[in-house]
Amino acid sequence: MSSPKQTPMIAQYLSIKAAHPETLLFFRMGDFYELFFDDAKQAAEALNIALTSRGKSEGEPIPMAGIPVHARQTYLNKLIEAGFKVAICEQMEPPGASKGPVRREVVRTVTPGTLTEESLLSPRENNYLVSYLPAAKRHPHALAALDLSTGEFFALTLEREDQVAAELSRLEPAELLIPDNWEPEPWLKGWKRCLSRRGSWSFDGKEGARVLLEHFQVTSLESFGVADSPPCLGVCGALLHYCRETQKEALSHITGLSRLHQQEGMVLDETCRRNLELNYNLKDGSRKSSLLGVMDRCITPMGSRLLAQWINRPLQSLDAIATRQESVSWLRENLVAYQDLRERLRMVHDLERFLSRIALRRASPRDLGGLRQTLQCLPQLYAILTPADGHSLAVPSLLRILADHFNGHEALTKQLEQQLADELPLNLKEGETIRLGFDQTLDTLRSLSRDGKSYLTKLEVEEREKTGIPSLKIKYHRSFGYSMEVTKTHLDKVPPRYIQRQTMTNGVRYVTEELKEYEEQLLTAEERMLEREQLLFEALAEQVARQAETLQASARAIATLDVLANFAHIAEERNYCRPLLHEGAVIEINQGRHPVVEQFSDTPFVANDIRLDNRQRTGLITGPNMAGKSTLMRQVALIVLLAHTGACVPAGSAKIGRVDRIFTRVGASDDLAGGRSTFMVEMTETAHILHHASERSLVILDEIGRGTSTYDGLSIAWAVAEHIHTQCQARTLFATHYHELTQLESQLDGVFNLTVEVKEWKDQILFLHTIVRGAADRSYGIHVAQLAGLPRAVTRRAREVLADLEEHAVHHPDSMGQGHAPASQPYQLTLFEDAPPSPALLELKRVDPDELTPKEALEALYRLKELL
């Protein structure tokens, strides 16, 4: 409730602000948006604009900052990038239309997860708004994601927190909605900046079902796949409710909802994405030299966004993969069609985001112009994929399905061609959006606005001839408007139809009904012209919005075609092969190359062969640094991943047994914010692999156990290798400097040694980057140090120390060097000591469940409970 000392305007501001406490309120006052109180202070600092004051509140000046209305988008961009939410409050009536302050309403709240403006979005990246409902006793975790800028909407349930974390790393939400009665767990800290708390009631399954039924105008949600999942209903409903509340629109472009199932896609956790540099490189965090960076040669933004989705969620269905592969192969074999498709796609615009802005009433004339040009291209794309020479049956089924979505837009295309001008302005208020000749009323208003002066000149000549007054002139006066001026000498010739308006010293000013009518038309022509053009434009946009569902299907078809053509383009350009995927365990890659390193190498990339199967499941790789161990392992992982997207791969040939997850433990750094050392980070990531890897997984391990003492590190690395091989039974590549691990080849069936060839010449080494069977006999660490630029005195001394250590390791294994007493391995404190066995565990080990009757089993359960 406002203080009685507040002005009516400030009282109105405070009332509106109270309803939007988490936002900066852009309060429209004439040609400016003003911000007051704390909002003004925050905006002034973030935007580097002046902080002033206006009036007083409780005796203190009210802080105020403002931005011009015409510059709103520029300042809005800066605030959103800084993490703010902004509520835009407009004047809903002309000043003076009512007593008291002008009526104002918030027409939209702009948040990081609800952006649609081109200037606020990256064209080749999705902008997901995600809602999350944590697991409870009766339901699993649930996530829903919506890209408001494209209309993509899906949900899924997950059993474990690590699965939720992996999905969030895939989606990279711009904003994450959570219930306000839930305190985020530590694992969610990485998303703290984008959290938005919402009323827990909005996550209720029944409320979600009501919102979805109302939005989609259906009586059942069975076809969407979420009807049997209250958690899915809850997160979907929370998303839609939030978007309605912030956008103040019907969201007509959200025409569908799909339910994803985790088993349908390969699981890639955040560590894997980071280590394999799928989306961003580790050097500077940009897309350059990431997998996506080198694989994205898509023509359209829609294609680039879909490619990112495919790379971040590879398929598990071999049939679905083969369907994509067939289309890529057809495009490679039909070079003319493939080149023609790529050329036609250059004329296609971002149809998905156009439709979003059209549905939300934010479309510009050029959005509709881009839609027109895109629709004009569709018949050409259809013709390429359905050749008239009778060979259409040779076109793969996926391409034929895509082609079907390019039909059916002829009427809308014609309407856009007839109604829109050829050259379109950026802004509707600039005029000239509707084609000349389409609307007679608009044409008349344009003539009035454009040709008013010539009309008055013509009228002036006509009146002189009719009245015989040669000095008659039509002039404009600010106070009286247009009038005909007649000098005193010709007043006797003034006809009765002239109406006297003003007497002057040397004559009289007159008007006629015709001039009065024209004056009214002329003075309001510009305003009425813009109103008429806006009316016609909005009607056309509404026509488009009503066809959103079919247009979105066409947009998805364009994106899919673009990605498939992109795969064909890269395969041809870089000599990639089509991999054979199968349900077996064999991963066999002949002449494989790293898809990223190859593109940035100044010298020809050295290809390598690798084979993993049930007989040789764990490859232990030894060799010096810089020799190529890490490159090889990442290369194998990336080839496997690309194969599961349907793409061709950088190899001479490849057979890939289906992989459900890729795990990587490559490099590590301190987690200072989390209070974890490099070694703790390494062990945490390794533990995650040991708990979740299966025989269907591919595991990449690089230098386990480096962050502790030599013996501890060796022991851990040995135990980890054994566990993964014997318990997880995952297909594994394990690079290590612990040469002792090579003994596992003779101890465990299926473990085999690999090494990187090195050539020595005159105290120099040459890395051949070739992987061969066998174990390395030296680490060449000093050679690498010399290459890195260590002073010669240091490397010379290092060789002396190494020679001394090696000599005494052979002749005096218990001595560290000449003159030293035998040394024992120093005791290292451990975090966890072995605890005595639990009585309950001992009792449980004695129980044979196959020998118990139901009554005995129940009694055993009670005994165990008493022992806990």
Curated annotation (Swiss-Prot):
Residue intervals passing through the bilayer: none
Gene3D superfamilies documented for this protein: 1.10.1420.10, 6.10.140.430, DNA repair protein MutS, domain I (3.40.1170.10), MutS, connector domain (3.30.420.110), P-loop containing nucleotide triphosphate hydrolases (3.40.50.300)
Keyword line: ATP-binding, DNA damage, DNA repair, DNA-binding, Nucleotide-binding
GO cellular component: cytosol
Binding site for ATP: G623, P624, N625, M626, A627, G628, K629, S630
Sample GO molecular function, one term: mismatched DNA binding
NCBIfam families cross-referenced by the UniProt entry: mutS1, PRK05399.1
Function: This protein is involved in the repair of mismatches in DNA. It is possible that it carries out the mismatch recognition step. This protein has a weak ATPase activity.
Family membership: Belongs to the DNA mismatch repair MutS family.
Protein name: DNA mismatch repair protein MutS
Organism: Magnetococcus marinus (strain ATCC BAA-1437 / JCM 17883 / MC-1)
Lineage: Bacteria, Pseudomonadati, Pseudomonadota, Alphaproteobacteria, Magnetococcales
